[in-house]
C-alpha cells in the first residue's frame, strides 16, 4: 500500500485486505487493528519480506538468521502447525489473506493458552515474537529493544482502532460492480 500509517487508506486501496482482516476477526476474535499492527511491524506489508542474511567475512551473503518470511514473518515450524490445524492446500505466507489468518490463529491460541486479552497488542506481540513458551518464561524482559517494539505495536494498534472505527461502516457498505 502507498501508506502504512492509516488503516482506512490501506483498506480503501486494498479492499480484499479489508475483507480478509474482517474474516479473520470474525473467525478468531482478534481485532482487525491488532492483526494489522502486528503485520505492519513484522513485514511493513511486504509480501515476500525476509530477514537479512548474515554476512560471511563481512560481505558475502550467508544464511538467514531465521526461516521467517511473508507478511506475518511466520517461521517454518509454526507455519506447519497452522497448516495442520487449518488444513487446505495452496496456502502461502506471501498471500495477505493467509497471513492475516495465521496472525489471528496464533493470537487466538495465545489468548486461550496464556489468558492475554485479545485487545492487548503489546503482550500478544511479545508472545508472537518470543513464542508462547518464551513469553511464559519472560524471555522478553531482558530485551529492552523488544519491549520498545511491543510498545510501538500497541500504539499502532490503538491508532488503527481509532481510524477503523471511523471508516468501518463505509467499508462494510462498499459494493463492487463487475
Placement of each model-derived feature along the sequence:
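Catalytic glycan-binding domains that act on GlcNAc-containing polysaccharides
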Residues: 2-171
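Gram-negative outer-membrane assembly/targeting C-terminal domains
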Residues: 170-178
Amino acid at each position: 500500500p502507498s501508506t502504512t500509517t492509516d488503516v482506512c487508506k490501506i483498506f480503501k486501496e486494498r479492499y480484499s485486505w479489508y475483507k480478509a482482516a474482517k474474516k479473520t476477526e470474525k473467525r478468531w476474535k482478534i481485532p482487525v487493528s491488532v492483526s494489522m499492527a502486528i503485520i505492519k511491524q513484522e513485514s511493513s506489508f511486504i509480501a515476500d519480506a525476509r530477514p537479512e542474511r548474515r554476512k560471511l567475512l563481512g560481505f558475502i551473503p550467508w544464511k538467514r538468521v531465521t526461516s521467517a518470511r511473508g507478511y506475518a514473518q511466520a517461521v517454518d515450524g509454526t507455519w506447519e502447525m497452522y497448516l495442520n490445524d487449518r488444513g487446505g492446500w495452496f496456502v502461502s505466507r506471501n498471500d495477505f489473506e493467509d497471513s492475516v489468518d495465521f496472525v489471528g490463529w496464533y493470537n487466538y491460541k495465545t489468548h486461550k493458552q496464556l489468558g492475554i486479552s485479545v485487545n492487548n497488542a503489546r503482550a500478544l506481540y511479545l508472545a508472537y515474537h518470543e513464542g508462547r513458551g518464551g513469553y511464559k518464561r519472560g524471555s522478553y524482559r531482558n530485551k529492552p529493544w523488544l519491549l520498545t517494539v511491543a510498545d510501538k505495536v500497541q500504539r499502532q494498534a490503538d491508532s488503527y482502532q481509532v481510524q477503523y472505527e471511523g471508516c468501518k461502516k463505509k467499508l462494510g457498505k462498499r459494493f463492487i460492480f463487475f
